[in-house]
Amino acid sequence: LDGTSGLSENLSLGEISPIECWNAGLKALEEGHDAAEIFLKELVWREFAYHLAHHTPRILDNNWRQEWNNFPWNTNDKDEKVILWQQGRTGIPFVDAAMRELYVTGRMHNRGRMIVASFLTKHLMTHWKIGLKWFENCLIDWDPASNAMGWQWSAGSGPDATPYFRVFNPNTQLEKFDGKYEYRNRWLAEFSGKNSKNALSFFDAIPKKWKLTPEMEYPAPVVDLSQGRVAALDAYKNREF
């Protein structure tokens, strides 16, 4: 899950300008660097978020597509499954690895963000604003516009959102992007034991009230992925707009 520019926090803090990144990306593209095209597309996506936040500021804290206001998402941020999602204890390795990395480092790869957002809003049928608020508390590259658009893209309530029937399977995604389980083992002590300082650092970073230790067994999944997908699709298909 490497291969990012690592500039997201610099952009969010104003330490580097989008136009400077754009010019550097164009130069790299002209020099034949294939990844430059992806970089430029992501930069445009970021600026699109700011465009939307300026012209339709409701995207920052409300459904951009207002017909989603009556969708039956869970809105209880104290829900047990929500807390397990926050703690990286869902029993779904890709989700948990990404959430623990987030808590320790304040960072998360874009692929991880898509997976954990899809899982929360679709498999757990939880309102995207709960996830957005947790990201706001944890990310060092927190960007109101980009994150609001990203969460609403995953949930289906935003502009140019992912189709409602696109529900990421975290286990399939793990096999595709982390086939050797290097990322999983880097962040989940239950799989790596005491061989990963990164995984163990999570238990030093978390609040004591969570009462989690590296010796604990890895939890069972909070939801069956197949059943969760079917339930989400049924809810999306039967939504009343």
Where are these regions (language model features)?
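C-terminal catalytic domain of photolyase/cryptochrome flavoproteins
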Residues: 1-241
